[in-house]
A protein has these predicted regions:
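Acidic, metal-coordinating catalytic segment for phosphate/diphosphate chemistry
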Residues: 1-44
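Conserved Nudix-box catalytic region and its N-terminal flanking loop in Nudix hydrolases
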Residues: 45-88
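Conserved beta-strand segments that form the floor/walls of ligand-binding pockets within enzyme
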Residues: 26, 54, 66, 98, ...
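Unchanged
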Residues: 72-157
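Short connector loops at helix/strand junctions that flank enzyme active sites
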Residues: 22, 37-41, 62, 67, ...
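A generic fold-level signal
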Residues: 1, 39, 48, 107-110, ...
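Conserved hydrophobic/aromatic beta-strand scaffold that supports enzyme active sites
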Residues: 5, 45, 55, 114-116, ...
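A broadly conserved sequence feature marking short terminus-proximal activation segments
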Residues: 1-3, 156-162
Length: 162
């Protein structure tokens, strides 16, 4: 989000050069910069003991398969958010969790932190967000996820790291 008015005093911001940052929204009244903000989210490829990836269909987009994803709550670490989202969206408990990298999602004004997780058992989501899920081989997951999507990039990063 790009600020146009100061969140503290409401004054319209001006652009001021700040070091290597270039022009930054600046409040003359509060004498401080307001850097652009974005949401930080997790996206996790949950895998079973066979190395299969859990693909899900959400109620809001039933035509597309996705990975477990969600927003990080205030005071929550990225790892805790990944474990929480896995529990909420699959009913599974992550036995391992490995950070894979970060991907900017410009359309959603988000930074996605990617993880690989392993879990045992079969998914039983307790979420109204999830329509269905299935286990897929790594290659089937790459083919099934939207071309160029962050989900596809996370799965390819896991595949290529082995």
């Amino acid at each position: 989000m790009r600020y146009t008015h100061c969140p503290d005093c409401g004054q319209r911001l001006s652009a001021r050069p700040i070091g290597d940052e270039g022009l930054v929204p600046w409040c003359e009244s509060c004498r401080r910069p307001w850097f652009d903000t974005f949401s930080t989210c997790i996206i996790t490829a949950v895998m079973n003991e066979k190395g299969e990836v859990l693909l899900q269909r959400e109620t809001r987009r039933p035509d597309r398969e996705v990975l477990v994803a969600g927003y990080i709550k205030p005071g929550e670490s990225a790892e805790d958010a990944a474990r929480r989202e896995i529990r909420e969206e699959t009913g599974l408990t992550a036995t391992t969790l490995r950070y894979m990298g970060s991907w900017p999602h410009m359309e959603g004004n988000m930074l996605m932190l990617g993880f690989a997780a392993t879990a045992e058992g079969e998914p039983s989501p307790d979420s109204s967000e999830i329509l269905s899920d299935r286990w897929a081989t790594m290659e089937d997951a790459v083919r099934s996820l939207r071309e160029g999507s962050i989900a596809q990039q996370v799965v390819m990063a896991i595949r290529d790291h082995k």
